[in-house]
């Protein structure tokens, strides 16, 4: 997707992030419109209304960017059958395997450890995993991810001009965040590499695959001046990098 010279991307929140649901962000440069993460099926009407409120229609959306494939980020992809879907194949394949194993009634607790090897390092590990399984069994539907022909794997193809994918893989393998490089104000769409500005522990509904990398990803994001859009919190601006203890 090539842009007109001087075209600048703007970021607009369509669905605000919360501990219950992921943020969905519209990236628009006037001629081209993309959505970062599409949310859950029960949010479809809210997403469609937000698109209309932005002066657009679902058919105007030229592309989807999935930060990763947890259920709260991808299950409205199917609302956009003509859109290219930019994502990491590593994240896609990992999550497809995870959700398949979570459906195993006899062995799911044992199987989940191969995806989340640090599970027992967390006090509420069993609660986290039981919630994950409950949500997966209720909502997971691979048909809602979109057609295989729509996918553009970032391992082989770059994002549209002016947007850059940064791998932030502490949350899940292949997780990507989006750097909006040529906007009026630099913006960083974090996905779940940054759940919220300052209360990740309060809304941690998913155990990171790699806690050390997850913390490094968080610090990386918070070291950037500009507008920050977390996966499960309100967006905020940083004028200068904060000082970490």
Task: Tell where the protein language model's regions lie, with residue ranges.
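Active-site metal-binding motif and surrounding structural segment of the metallo-beta-lactamase
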Residues: 44-91
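Hydrophobic "anchor" residues on beta-strands that sit immediately upstream
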Residues: 33, 64, 84, 188, ...
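Divalent metal-coordination and catalytic microenvironments
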Residues: 27, 37, 61, 68, ...
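Short, acidic/turn-prone active-site loops that include or flank metal/cofactor-
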Residues: 89-93, 192-195
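Conserved beta-strand hairpin/beta-sheet module of binuclear metal-dependent hydrolase folds
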Residues: 1-53, 177-195
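Metallo-beta-lactamase
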Residues: 42, 90-167, 209-226, ...
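Short loop/helix-cap segments at secondary-structure boundaries that form the rim of catalytic
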Residues: 5, 75-81, 238-242
């Amino acid at each position: 997707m090539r842009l007109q010279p001087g075209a600048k991307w703007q970021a607009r929140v369509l669905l605000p992030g919360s501990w219950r649901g992921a943020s969905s962000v519209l990236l628009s440069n006037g001629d081209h419109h993309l959505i970062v993460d599409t949310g859950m099926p029960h949010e479809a009407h809210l997403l469609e209304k937000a698109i209309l409120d932005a002066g657009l229609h679902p058919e105007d959306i030229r592309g989807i960017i999935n930060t990763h494939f947890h259920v709260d980020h991808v299950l409205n992809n199917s609302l956009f059958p003509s859109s290219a879907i930019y994502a990491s194949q590593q994240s896609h394949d990992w999550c497809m395997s995870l959700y398949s194993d979570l459906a195993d009634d006899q062995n799911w607790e044992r199987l989940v450890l191969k995806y989340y090897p640090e599970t027992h390092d967390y006090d509420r590990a069993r609660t986290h995993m039981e919630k994950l399984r409950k949500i997966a069994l209720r909502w997971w539907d691979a048909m809602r991810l979109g057609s295989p022909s729509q996918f553009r794997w970032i391992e082989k193809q770059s994002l549209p001009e002016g947007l850059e994918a940064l791998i932030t893989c502490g949350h899940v393998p292949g997780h990507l965040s989006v750097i909006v490089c040529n906007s009026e104000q630099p913006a960083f769409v974090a996905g779940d590499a940054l759940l919220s500005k300052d209360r990740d522990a309060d809304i941690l509904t998913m155990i990171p695959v790699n806690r050390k990398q997850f913390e490094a990803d968080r610090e990386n994001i918070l070291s950037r001046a500009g507008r920050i859009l977390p996966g499960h919190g309100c967006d905020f601006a940083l004028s200068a990098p904060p000082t970490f203890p």
